[in-house]
A protein has these predicted regions:
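Flavin-dependent oxidoreductase catalytic cores
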Residues: 1-176
Length: 176
């Protein structure tokens, strides 16, 4: 498994390994191993909406209980050997969860926040709640990256035009 994440495989390409877990000890152990292998940043996945992932309380399943999420973040940020970035959805059930979630995330020294502006319940349906991303740009103390429904160059140009201050764009399913 370690050979698969060797930095030598990504020579010349800025790569950030992503960890999908709900166990802080596992995150810290894996982050240390990745840091020792040469990575300076690790990404925490709070965005995966897959039913098989969220049923185990991982990915966007962690957004269901802010208290559990806060305890997890307290532990990993206290022991992090390197920078931690986060990819997240804007809530589990409802867009109304976003202000409190953003406030919670803003308590931590996140190196970069990637926002997919849908809830877990929405999966990939409907339109992204871009106003939630705008709120992150306005309120977050760290750089914010947009993710969701970017399929063309025109989509990317429109997003960066409409939301100045966007640190970067993340293209997921739109690339496929």
């Amino acid at each position: 498994e370690q050979a698969a994440v060797s930095p030598a495989l990504n020579a010349g390409i800025p790569a950030v390994p992503q960890i999908l877990t709900k166990n802080a000890e596992h995150f810290i152990h894996t982050a240390r191993a990745l840091h020792e292998a040469g990575y300076d940043e690790i990404n925490l996945n709070l965005g995966c909406p897959s039913g098989t992932v969220t049923a185990k309380g991982k990915g966007s399943g962690m957004l269901r209980d802010p208290g559990v999420l806060a305890a997890f973040l307290d532990e990993i940020f206290a022991a992090a050997p390197c920078a931690i970035s986060v990819k997240t959805r804007i809530g589990y059930d409802s867009v109304e969860e976003w202000p409190a979630l953003l406030a919670l995330l803003s308590r931590y020294p996140i190196s970069e926040l990637t926002v997919h502006p849908r809830t877990r319940r929405e999966l990939y349906g409907g339109s992204p709640h871009k106003e939630a991303f705008a709120q992150a740009l306005k309120c977050a103390p760290f750089p914010c990256v947009y993710n969701g429904d970017l399929r063309t160059k025109a989509d990317c140009a429109a997003l960066t035009r409409d939301y100045p201050g966007t640190a970067a764009l993340m293209i997921g399913r739109g690339l496929v």
